[in-house]
A protein has these predicted regions:
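Metallocofactor- and cofactor-centric catalytic cores in central/energy metabolism, strongly enriched
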Residues: 1-423, 427, 432, 438-513
Length: 513
């Protein structure tokens, strides 16, 4: 393979080594740069000599400052660059840079004729799976619900072939918490909104203990919406464990009977609600996987659908690029408000956004959170941001939304479920078996080395973009079509084939008691 290094923007003074084996000292890249040391795949090479204090630029943006002289051809990494200050929220002005609305009317018209086969719900939402969800109001019942989940899967699901799975949503909330504290609204509305996810068909089954602070009625949908049942384990009619089990199994059957009647029907792409997330990111994430996913996101938005991206600490250092994409000044201010809230949240915990990057990120070539954030936002595509959704809330508008979440894969996925996603696209460069059993998770690899090694864990390889074998546009269309196939149930994702699922993790900024 040829010596390959990728320069992201014309004024960058570093390039990314793309050769899978890395490059040896003496290798020549981009015509004139001779490596003075061995540099691993994904890491940066200096394209000019940088003196102490000089800007280090990638994506056309400053990602750091040289802490000492860095010779041309040297390895640029977290050891020789310093972290810049984050963009100051108070000085970022709203100067809209929105794409012309008339440029792609023909494409929009074509996309709005595209369809997939989904489960239409009574409230108009559409599911891509047909799942019996058991919601819990307190951690105390988790042992019972785990037992019940296995029993239903073994004994009842075979009798209801149209139901894909049963899922118990256990969590650590419900008691021993300051239930009336301002931050308590986040976990409470998260639990409530997850129970109403479109993939559950409007069937809400809540198991409570009976004495908990979080009353099941508080997380139930408004009266009259869908099928709701609440069962307390402390109900005096239950004599012992097996009577509890029988009571829950009887309740589950009433919901399974209704879910089993659901049938897939032709639905518009406008019915898709796709959550974009990245985890285990590397230097290629912002070159391949995220831009490809962003292109697919733009297609879904053009078709009238809903897409959201998240992870506050992974957009904080790119907020100056996002504010101009806000649909109006109100949305721009909401973006800045969510950044400010999280800045304060981290400050109260005596941390800052630099705590985000992992050893894996750095091993994959990401020197700091600035570089990571600039690549992370590429998965949002180029569409205008129509709304900002606070943690635990549902999306309110079609189009591209920012759903404010922590960057933790598990907390982010949980909050995106609460926001109403019926499809999940997860981009990784280092690799993670992350999966959710409530929603299909399409795993996108940023590099072919990972995709080849994890051939049965990765659903889509965006790596060919790095070497010019495919364009972002070509791969974006391919991912778009894969999303439709998975949403229709005609193709299974790797996590569903292998049964690899993570627990949900509630984000609780409120105090424990």
């Amino acid at each position: 393979m040829h010596n390959t290094a990728i320069k992201t923007a014309p004024n960058d003074n570093v390039a990314i080594v793309a050769t899978p084996t890395g490059l040896k000292r003496g290798s020549i890249v981009l015509g004139t740069t001779v490596l003075v040391e061995e540099i691993p795949m994904g890491h940066k090479v200096a394209l000019q000599t940088l003196e102490m204090g000089d800007e280090v630029r990638r994506y056309g943006q400053v990602i750091g400052y040289a802490t000492r002289t860095i010779e041309k051809g040297s390895w640029v990494n977290e050891g020789n660059i310093s972290l810049p200050e984050p963009p100051k929220l108070e000085v970022i002005e709203y100067k809209p840079v929105l794409p012309p609305v008339e440029d792609d009317e023909e494409l929009k018209a074509q996309l709005r004729k595209v369809s997939f086969m989904g489960y239409r719900n009574a409230d108009g939402s559409v599911g891509t799976k047909n799942v019996l969800a058991i919601t819990t109001s307190v951690q105390c019942v988790a042992g019972i619900t785990n037992f019940i989940e296995n029993k239903i899967r073994k004994e009842l699901l075979p009798l209801y072939p149209n139901v894909d799975d049963v899922v118990a949503f256990n969590h650590s909330y419900g008691c021993g918490v300051a239930i009336d504290a301002p931050g308590a609204i986040v976990p409470i509305r998260t639990i409530k909104n997850i129970a109403q996810n479109p993939n559950f068909g409007g069937e809400v089954m809540i198991i409570g203990l009976g004495c908990e602070k979080l009353r099941p009625e508080k997380i139930a949908p408004p009266s009259g919406e869908g099928g709701l049942s609440i069962l307390y384990l402390q109900d005096e009619r239950f004599e012992g464990f097996y009577e509890m089990v029988d009571g829950i199994m009887e309740l589950a059957e009433t919901h399974l009977q209704k879910l089993n009647q659901r049938q897939r029907t032709r639905c518009s792409v406008a019915d898709l609600v796709v959550g974009m997330q990245c985890g285990g990111s590397d230097a290629f994430s912002g070159l391949t996987g995220n831009p490809v996913s962003g292109f697919a996101a733009d297609l879904i938005v053009k078709a009238g659908g809903t897409v959201f991206f998240s992870e506050v600490t992974e957009v904080r250092d790119a907020i100056h690029l996002l504010v101009p994409r806000a649909m109006d000044e109100t949305v721009a201010q909401k973006l800045k408000d969510e950044m400010a809230w999280y800045d304060n949240y981290l400050y109260q915990g005596q941390a800052d956004r630099s705590a985000n990057t992992t050893p894996g990120n750095k091993g994959g070539g990401l020197s700091n959170i600035v570089e990571k954030a600039l690549g992370s936002v590429a998965k949002s595509g180029t569409s205008p941001i129509v709304d900002v959704v606070s943690p635990g809330e549902k999306v309110r508008k079609k189009g591209l939304n920012f759903v404010a979440t922590p960057a933790s894969d598990f907390a982010c996925g949980t909050l995106q479920l609460a926001a109403g996603m019926n499809m999940h696209v997860f981009i990784t460069g280092r690799g993670t078996p992350y999966g959710l059993n409530m929603v299909p998770v399409i795993k996108v690899s940023s590099n072919s080395k990972l995709a080849n090694r994890w051939h049965d864990l990765i659903d889509f390889d965006a790596g060919p973009v790095a070497f010019g074998e495919k364009t972002i546009e070509e791969m974006g269309w391919a991912l778009f079509h894969l999303i439709l196939e998975v949403a229709s149930g005609t193709k299974k994702v790797a996590t569903d084939k292998l049964g690899l699922y993570n627990d949900l993790v509630l984000f609780n900024p409120g105090p424990l008691t």
